[in-house]
Amino acid sequence: MIGNYNYGTGRRKSAVARVFIKSGSGQIVVNGKPANEYFSRETGLMVIRQPLELTNNVETFDIMVNVNGGGESGQAGAVRHGITRALIDYDATLKPELSKAGFVTRDAREVERKKVGLRKARRAKQFSKR
C-alpha cells in the first residue's frame, strides 16, 4: 500500500470498510473483486457511488476497499461512509456538500437485542384469550 492514497474508515451496522482512494480511472475494487461483481444488487452499487456522483468524481479516483462484517446492505453503507471520509481527506472543501447530503454522519442505528421472555426484540409470544 505504498503511494499517495487517501484513506477513510466507514462503519454501518456491524460492517467496517477500509477505503483507499488514489487518482485513476474510476475503478472500484471491493475485497479483490470489481464492485459490480461483489454487490449482487444494483442498490449496493448505487449507494457506494453516491458521494462520487455528488462531488463529480466518478471517473477521477481508483478505489480499493476492504470490508468485513454485516450483510450486503450494511457493507454498502460502510463503503459509502468510508469513501466520503477518504474524499474529505483528499479535499476538505468537499465536506459541507457531503455533510448536507448526510453522507458524513455515521448511521448509528444498530440491531436491538432480543429480550428474555419475548420471541424477538419486541415481539411477544402469541396471546390466547381462551
UniProtKB/Swiss-Prot annotation:
* Keyword terms, alphabetized: Ribonucleoprotein, Ribosomal protein
Out of the domains of life, which is the source? Bacteria
What does the entry give for GO biological process? translation
The yes or no answer to whether the keyword Cell membrane is present is no
Query: Do you know which SUPFAM superfamilies this protein is assigned to?
Result: Ribosomal protein S5 domain 2-like
What GO molecular functions are on record for this protein? RNA binding; structural constituent of ribosome
Give the matching PROSITE patterns.
RIBOSOMAL_S9
InterPro entries documented for this protein: Ribosomal_Su5_D2-typ_SF, Ribosomal_uS9, Ribosomal_uS9_bac/plastid, Ribosomal_uS9_CS, Ribsml_uS5_D2-typ_fold_subgr
For this record, an example GO cellular component is: cytosolic small ribosomal subunit
Task: Show the NCBIfam families listed in the entry.
Answer: PRK00132.1
* Family statement drawn from the similarity comment of this UniProt entry: Belongs to the universal ribosomal protein uS9 family.
How is this protein named in the record?
A: Small ribosomal subunit protein uS9
Identify the gene encoding this protein. Answer: rpsI
